[in-house]
Amino acid sequence: MIRRFRRTKIVATLGPSTDNHIILENMIKSGVNVFRLNFSHGTREEHIYRAKLVTSIAKRLNCHIALLGDLQGPKIRICKFQDKKVFLKVNNYFILDANLNENLGTSERVGIDYKNLPKDVKKCDILLLDDGKIQLKVINIVDQEIFTKIIIGGVLSNNKGINKLGGGLSARILTKKDKRDIITSIDIGVDYLAVSFPRYGSDLDHARKCAVKFGSKAKIIAKIERAEAVKDLKIIDEIILASDAIMVARGDLGVEIGESELAGIQKTLIRRARQLNRVVITATQMMESMINNPMPTRAEVMDVANAVLDGSDAVMLSAETASGKYPIETIKVMSKVCMGAEKMPSINVSQHRIHDKFHDIEEAIAMSAMYAANHLSGITAIITMTESGKTSLMTSRITSGLPIFALSSHIQTLKLTALYRGVTPIFFNSSKEGVSAANEVINLLVKRGFLEPGNLVIITQGDIMGKVGKTNTSRILKV
C-alpha cells in the first residue's frame, strides 16, 4: 500500500531557538517544508548564517526546503520611553507626538516613527497600540501632535505597533529597510518574498518591480494585514492575482478589522486564493502556547485543524520556533494535527473551476488529470513532470486524498513546490521523452518507495522535455 503523506505544508520561522544544527535537522525530519526569515528581527549576518545552515542540512538530507524572506514593511510604531515602559490609566489623556525625540517618551506623550500619522487620522478615530491591548480615541490634532483619550489602558512599552481601527494608514509599501532586506534576500537566494501591509494590487506590482530591479527571482507573497485589503471581494481578488501566494496574517488584520470578523475573512481569503490558482498560508499564533509549553491548547489544535479543513496550503509558526522552548515538539504536534484533519472527507471533494474556462493547455491538462484521478477508481498517485512547477500548482488546487509528485531537474522549481499542498518534490533529470521518460519516472518512484507494482498512476508531461509551458499530455499507467 502506498504510504500516507501529510498534505498541508509547515512553515517554521528561524531564530535563536533554531541556531543549533541538531535542532534544525530534527525540525526538518519532523516535517518542516519552508523556513521563514523574519526581517523584522535579526541582523543581515544572522539571516545569512541561518539560511546557509538550512541549505547545507537540506542538501545532506536530500530534501527540498524552501526559504521565505518576510519583509517588515511599513509597520507604524511608537518610539521609546525614558523608563522603557509606562502605565496608561483609563480616561487619562495621552499625546502621540511626531516631533518628540525618539527616546524621551513619558506617561503623557511619546514619539512616533511615522511622521505623517497626524495627517492620516481625524477626531473620533480609534488607535490600537500593541495589537489592540491599548486603545486610544483621537480627540484633536494640532500640527504634529495627536491628542487622545485612553479608552483601554495598561502597560505600554517601547516600539509597540500602532493600528487604526478600520484601516486608513497610508505609509508606503516598501521602506528603506525593506529595500536593504530585499538585497539580503537576493544574497541568500530566498524562494519566496513576503510583502507586508499591501492595501491594493498596485502595491504588489510596485514591490515586484522593485524586487526584480534589484535582481530578485523570488515569488511574491502578499501578507493580508490591512483592513483596506479585505474591504470587498474586488480588492481581495486584485491583491491575490497580483501575487504568487498570500499569507493570512491574522495579527494586524484582526486588530484592524476586529476579531469577530476574522474567521469569516480567513475562510474567504483561502477559498478565493485556491479558486484563483494561488497558494495560501495561514499564520499567526497557531500554537502560541507552545512557546513556553510542550503541549498546545485544545483551541490551538482546533485552529490548526480548521485552517487545514479550509484548504490552506500551509500553516505557519512564528515565535513558537524562532524563540520558543520546544521548536521540535511544536513541529511534531502540528504535523500530527494536520494529518488528523486531512482524514476528514470534506476536503477530498472539489468543484474547482468546473464551471470556468481554462486559461491555457497546461491548466486544461492539470484539471483533467485531477478530475480523472478523483473519479477513476484505483488511482493511487498523480505525477507531474514539470519545468516551472506550474502543472504541479494547478493539480494541487483540486483537493483530493492523493499524493502529487513533482519531478523536475530544476532545484529552484522543486523548492517552490515545497509550499504547494499535497505536492512532494523529487529531483529527476533524463534525456528521455514521452512514454520512455514516464516509465523512467515510475521506476524511480518505485525505487524510492513511493510506488508499488500494481499501482495505477496519472502522469502529466510535455512532448518536449526541458521547455517551460509545454505540458500537453496526460497518461494513465499501471506500475
Swiss-Prot record:
It catalyses: pyruvate + ATP = phosphoenolpyruvate + ADP + H(+). Mg(2+) binds at E225, D252. K(+) binds at N38, S40, D70. Its cofactor is Mg(2+); K(+). One of its GO terms (molecular function) is pyruvate kinase activity. Pathway: Carbohydrate degradation; glycolysis; pyruvate from D-glyceraldehyde 3-phosphate: step 5/5. Its EC number is 2.7.1.40. The record marks K223 as: Transition state stabilizer. Allosterically activated by AMP and by several sugar phosphates. Belongs to type II PK. ATP binds at N38, F39, S40, H41, R77, K160. InterPro entries: Pyr_Knase (IPR001697), Pyrv/PenolPyrv_kinase-like_dom (IPR015813), Pyrv_kinase-like_dom_sf (IPR040442), Pyrv_Knase-like_insert_dom_sf (IPR011037), Pyrv_Knase_AS (IPR018209), Pyrv_Knase_brl (IPR015793), Pyrv_Knase_C (IPR015795), Pyrv_Knase_C_sf (IPR036918). Substrate binds at R36, G251, D252, T284. Keywords: Allosteric enzyme, ATP-binding, Glycolysis, Kinase, Magnesium, Metal-binding, Nucleotide-binding, Potassium, Pyruvate, Transferase. Belongs to the pyruvate kinase family. Homotetramer. PANTHER family: PYRUVATE KINASE (PTHR11817). This is Pyruvate kinase. It comes from Buchnera aphidicola subsp. Baizongia pistaciae (strain Bp).
